[in-house]
Structure formats: C-alpha cells, structure tokens
Amino acid sequence: MEKKRTEQRNGVEKKIWEIADKLRGTIDGWDFKSYVLIGLFYRFLSENLCKYFNDSERRNNPDFSYENLTDDYEAIDALKDAAIASKGFFIKPSQLFQNVVKSIRENKNNEDLNTTLRDIFDDIEKSTELGDGRSKESFKGLFKDFNVSEVKLGSTLTIRTEKLKELLTSIDTMELDEFEKNSIDAFGDAYEFLISMYAQNAGKSGGEFFTPQDISELLARIAIGKKDTVDDVYDMACGSGSLLLQVIKVLGKEKTSLVSYYGQEINHTTYNLCRMNMILHNIDYANFNIINADTLTTKEWEKHYVNCSNENGFEVVVSNPPYSISWAGDKKSNLVSDVRFKDAGTLAPNSKADLAFVLHALYVLGQEGTAAIVCFPGILYREGKEQTIRKYLVDQNFVDAVIQLPSNLFSTTSIATSILVLKKNRDKKDPIFFIDGSNEFVREKKNNRLSPKNIEKIVDCFNSKKEEANFAKSVERDKIRESNYDLTVGKYVNSEAEKEELDIKVLNHSIDEIVDKQKDLRTKIKDIIQDIKVDFDNIDINN
C-alpha cells in the first residue's frame, strides 16, 4: 500500500512538473498555481456533475450521457433545477471541461478560448445564485484568480490562447481518481506539491498554505481520540483546508457525511483554495463555512462560534497557525478586554502571536472537545508574557499533552515543532503527558515524514497515556510549576542520546586543550603579521 501511495503521488507530481515546464518563462510560478488549481477544480466540477446526472438518469435510460447532450435538450431546465438543489451549481453540456478539451483536441475554432472560459466561469458562479441561493457564498469569487487576459501568459491573444489550450489538455491527462477510491488524496497531493513547490520559489512558507498529510493525520487522530463520530471540526488558520479534510480519512466517509467544517483564513487566494478543496472532496456546500478574515483581531470568528453544532464550542479543533508572526496585541485596546484573552492575565507579545492563537483555540473549544495545535518551540519555554500565559494554561488545567515532533517535516522549514493538546474536561488530578516523537520519522528525499508506523506509535501512546522510558512521561503540574512552567518535552523526557552522563574532568581537560591551542594559534598569527610588516618596511618603493 505504501509503495502504491508513493507511485501515485510521484505520478501526479510528474504531470504537474510537465505543465509547469510548458508555461515556464511566461508567468511567475507563484501566480501560475492559480491556473492549475482552478483548472483542476473546473475539471472536477464537470466530471462530478456528469456523474450525478448519469447515475440518476441511467436508471430509466441506460444510454443517457449528459456530456453528449446539447444545450437545448428538452429537459435541460429540469436537470438544471435538480443540480442547483442538490449540488448548488450548474454547467451547460457545451461548457463542460471535457467538451471544451474535446473541442481543443479536434482543432475546432478556439481563437476565443479566453472569453469562452471567462463566460463559463461567470455562468457557473451565477448559477449558484439560483434556487435558494445558499451555495452562493461557497462559490463566490472562486474563479477570480484565473485571469484569461493576463499578459504574462503571452504578449498576444494567440499566444495566450495556445497556453490555455496546453494547460487544459495537460490537466485532462492527469489520472485523478475519485477521492474515496484512491489510496491517496490525488487532488490533495497535487495541491500540496504545487503549493510547496511555488512557495519555495517565492520564499513563502509551505506550512502557511498546506499542512503535509502525515502531520494532518496525526493532528486529526490526536484531536478525535477514541471517538467514532464528531459533529464539527474547526481550524482557525485553515490554509487550503488539508487539516479539516483529515477528519474524513480518520473516521471514514460513512461517519462524516453530517460533519460541519469551519475554517478561517486571512489570505484571500488561500481562502479560495480551501473552499475549492472542500468542494473537490464532495463536502456539501451547506456543511462547510470558510471565512476570509483575520482570526485574532476581527470578530468574524463569532459567526462560527454561534453556529457550531455544540452550544458550548467545537468538538474538534485542529490547526497549524503561522509561527511567531507579529500582531496588534496591546496596541489595539479592545484586545486587552477580548473574551478570548482577558483571563490569561496578559496578551501574547506583539512580535509573537503564537499563544494568541492558542488562547483563541481554547476559547472556542467545547467542554468535551480536544484541540491539537502545531506550535513553534519557543512558546513552551520563553519567559515574560508567554510564561504568564503558560502559567494560566497549566494552573487552570487546560494542558493535556505536549508532543515533540521530528525536525524537517515541512518542505520549507527545518524547525522542530511540537503539538500542544488542550482539553477543558480534565480531572483536577490529571498530570500532563509528554511524548518525545523526535525520532519517529522516515527520510524521504530532502525531508523527514511520519510513516503510518510512526503515527500509530504516537497516537497509541497518547490514547493510553502509558509511560515509556525515553519516549513518554506523565508529569504532575506541581513539578511543572517548580520548573517555571516550562513545557519543553526534553525537560521531562530523556532521550537515549541524553542518557550518557558527561565526565566533568574529561570535559574540562578538553576545554583546557582547546584554550591552549587557541593561544598558540594567536601567537603564530601575530608572528606572521609581524614578519609581513617587516618585509613591507624593507621594500624600496623608489626602485
């Protein structure tokens, strides 16, 4: 299974590279991602709609094929109404991805392909306003970044048209099976690869947009725990939605058909990627709500909190928020009294918003819920305001566990992060559980990743809360207080590498030898400089 997964992922990546090569030199890689991702989305919508119509109509007419119909088909209005009610959108037969590509391959008149695509995307979005219009917000602006008139695609209309043809025909050749039938999330892997590839070129953090699937799976399994079903899942910095979608893979599609997905994302392009990802995974438009706004400084999050399935908060909170970014903090007076932050005794430092995200997650967490948050290591031990917030979290018994992750898990950073696990329903006597997963990885290309075996070991240990030498330990809160509220895993769990005690005498002797050698080298350097000076003084510049 693991070999098949790798082969499929490599196949998707190879095809994406081929597309990138075809457009290389004409458009910036970071901008190009929108063309491929929206092209994939367009293909998915078309195939998804055809499957919906064909499955329904072939019960009475085995030869029915929606893609072979004409736009003036006698029952087209009835089909349109059915699609709007069930899918939230509609595409005319002539506007289907496969029919547009067919026209390109048959070398029909495609000089106006740019306007054709623009009209198609406009019509799809307008169709979401029909019926009760509930799907409008889920589709609004999704095609905005597919600019068919972008001069970077080519200096003339003819060149741009050829590039668009190449793009669509290449996307058509991608072997992307349905999500539930594939041993990998093919569309998700395409997203992950594209975003990380272009993020590196643009100097952006891949973690800003897509959390790798192995880390996403670990976070989701930690937050879900031993539950068979959940009502809702929330990600306060959802990026392209990879973490939210892991709930489906962990629990299975049968048990997640009624799950509500909530997310918030500050970057508009990434916000669009997330909504597309929800739709690509057959999440009903009524079951996801993604907001484009600043999580920390606006009140938009309240819309989620009010509408979540549980009156007292979300059942599952998973997130990989940006590390140590600056935020308004105490420069914005209303944040001091904000219900999410006021009980902690201080706001997170203006230059490091990490714990502001943690406090936000805690506030929206339900009484029976679990939050699993990827954190920058510094927030676990730094003094000042961050220590004050850790004190609040520990004293109020909200910290359930801290899990150290291996370094180099993300494609654009080698930082060794940790997972902070929060709960509100802990017993007063419950200790905090620490797991050192720093050695739980396999090497793949230039990065580390968590194998299924690595994930299983960490999850099993977390669920059982069973101590294991050099791997996991339960620590009483009093001991953490004595350690100045330091939550670093290495403070309480000793790895194999740290077991060997240092011989102080040998260490001091080595230091003395280094110091003596340093003195000797300095003396030799001084002698060399002096010799050079003497030689220079003896030079007769008049000869």
UniProtKB/Swiss-Prot annotation:
GO terms for biological process: DNA restriction-modification system; methylation. Its EC number is 2.1.1.72. PROSITE patterns: N6_MTASE. Induction: Detected at low levels after 6 and 96 hours growth, there are fewer copies at 96 hours (at protein level). The methyltransferase is composed of M and S polypeptides. Belongs to the N(4)/N(6)-methyltransferase family. NCBIfam families: hsdM. This is Type I restriction enzyme MpnII methylase subunit. It comes from Mycoplasma pneumoniae (strain ATCC 29342 / M129 / Subtype 1).
